[in-house]
């Protein structure tokens, strides 16, 4: 911070490493005493101040305004925020105040605010929420500041903030106490602003393309729409077991049957599975369905959506992710599963990739248990897919659509008319992570019923992620569903890319954590 013409600011505080350890309990006790005194005065938590300006807007609007202009045409402001820095110097003081948009400096003098208020201000603490009315001026070093005329304490902070040099050093504490992380870390605030910008971009472009946003149930009588283990709960009024949804797909396709030809939903999915840097049991997806389209149309549309989201959220389609360039402006690659394997593991021949027994033997070298329930009836396509996951998936840095998924792992996708055993399905990978999954939808009710039966057989054999038989969805298909394409985009993983975040918990405001001790 810089000082105004009338005063000389003191030197900056020393680094936290030079600061003696503080007794947090003692600080909290002292602040509670201050709050008790405020309560006695009847002014502990006033709620009659209304800001007229925000810090960032003022900084932008008056960035080039000189002091002479501000003196000639005074700008009255009313602004409030959290006190992040305080420097008391006799009859004049500085305070850096942070609101929801940014920071601005207050210049507070005893002559302007009065002796009583100034004396009280000296006892206010970092973290307190304060308000000011006054005029803008520029310090002799050019910093835009507020010459405070009226100063108030709006909310007393009882807990000390982390030191400004290190913030929250413990990563888990950042997730657990996100409210503190947001206070002290502009990077965290920018991450979640970018998340909002990306989601707003998706919504805007979906509306421009004629899609209607809808809301479908979060509690399902039958889990469906994905291969995943659900969370289970109980509906007391109906006395029935319910499942938190693992995907909205089957309900959205019911709407296609009903005549809404373009629908989408952005909402939570829940999967009772593991936690990792790219998996959270509660996550956000956007799923969309368009009648009279297929998976080729979906790939073009999805590519355009993601490119626009990057531009809207970050200002460019060329990003840096984990110190590597990520160019979303170029056309996305398209490879079959076998083409991707041979690109990154060229030692495999066409003949080997067509040999199921060879693939089973090869997968064991990667530690894959091919005797697990999901492999009991695995065909060639499934074995190829698992080999792809072991050899190629993590190396797909540039945006790449992987196509031609086998029918046996795609129970809701339309089968290819030209290649037996293959579906019109894709998955989009960027930086080695799956970002989207889409396909031409299966609209043959009899074929869908048969695939559900096979899924039930797999579940009975021990595959917990196999799908249930959804008789009502089959009934809906029997009324006739037009040719349709559908896709799901993982919002959290997309935001990871756009914000250079290595862990999915970095882009979820309140991620799941183990119970606090």
Swiss-Prot record:
Q: How is the cofactor bound?
A: Binds 3 Mg(2+) ions per subunit.
Catalyzed reactions = tRNA(Lys) + L-lysine + ATP = L-lysyl-tRNA(Lys) + AMP + diphosphate
For whether the record's keyword set contains Membrane, the answer is no
Give an example GO biological process: lysyl-tRNA aminoacylation
Coiled-coil annotated spans: none
Q: Which family does it belong to?
A: Belongs to the class-II aminoacyl-tRNA synthetase family.
Q: Which HAMAP family match?
A: Lys_tRNA_synth_class2
Q: What is this protein called?
A: Lysine--tRNA ligase
Which source organism? Cupriavidus taiwanensis (strain DSM 17343 / BCRC 17206 / CCUG 44338 / CIP 107171 / LMG 19424 / R1) (Ralstonia taiwanensis (strain LMG 19424))
